[in-house]
């Protein structure tokens, strides 16, 4: 009678004896890591399948810092701001953690940003507004009085949201913020494919690669 199979158990670097005990008690046929660390030799020698976590878009800050133009981005829309007399200043980062995001004013903002008159529903011409980098604000020079306006802009993700969540919830101290890179970008795409091939060659004991953020 076969009493082994169809059970995968998680492990961690500080739970090796418990993992070995549960592997035997439950008849598990696979072990997966929880934190992406290397498997200790004791677990490699069990004969169980090894499921290894692989981070496709982070945990390589050296690359991320060397290629800041290929950091992941997202679009953010500001709240509605009402114009009165004179110019209207719309701050972009209100309510947004500067540890998490940074305004992308590197790319062509006239092409990629959008300022909308929400009262009329019309997008403003790029000549009707400008960006003040010192205050991280968009200034509409001659808005219609009492009309509401929003700005949609690109922001770099300078701290991976999953890593940020884990750091805050687990109260991690003195942990470097992991910067997510965009694997769709040309330099990072080529680097990521090379990095994955090198990982597979250097981890022959891994049966299944678990892609994660």
In which residue ranges do the predicted regions lie?
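Glycan-processing catalytic domains of CAZymes
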Residues: 1-213
């Amino acid at each position: 009678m076969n009493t082994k199979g169809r059970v995968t158990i998680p492990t961690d670097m500080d739970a090796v004896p418990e993992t070995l005990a549960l592997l035997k008690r439950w008849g598990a046929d696979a072990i997966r890591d929880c934190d992406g660390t290397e498997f200790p030799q004791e677990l490699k020698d069990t004969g169980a399948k090894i499921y290894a976590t692989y981070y496709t878009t982070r945990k390589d800050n050296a690359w991320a810092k060397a290629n800041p133009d290929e950091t992941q981005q997202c679009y953010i829309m500001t709240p509605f701001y009402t114009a009165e007399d004179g110019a209207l200043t719309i701050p972009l980062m209100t309510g947004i953690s500067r540890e998490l995001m940074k305004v992308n004013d590197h790319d062509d903002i006239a092409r990629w940003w959008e300022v909308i008159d929400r009262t009329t529903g019309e997008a403003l011409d790029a000549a009707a507004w400008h960006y003040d980098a010192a205050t991280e604000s968009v200034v509409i020079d001659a808005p219609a009085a009492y009309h509401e306006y929003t700005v949609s802009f690109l922001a770099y993700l300078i701290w991976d949201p999953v890593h940020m969540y884990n750091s805050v919830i687990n109260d991690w101290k003195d942990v470097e913020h992991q910067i997510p890179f965009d694997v769709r970008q040309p330099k990072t795409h080529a680097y990521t494919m090379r990095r994955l091939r090198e990982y597979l060659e250097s981890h022959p004991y891994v049966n299944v690669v678990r892609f994660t953020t």
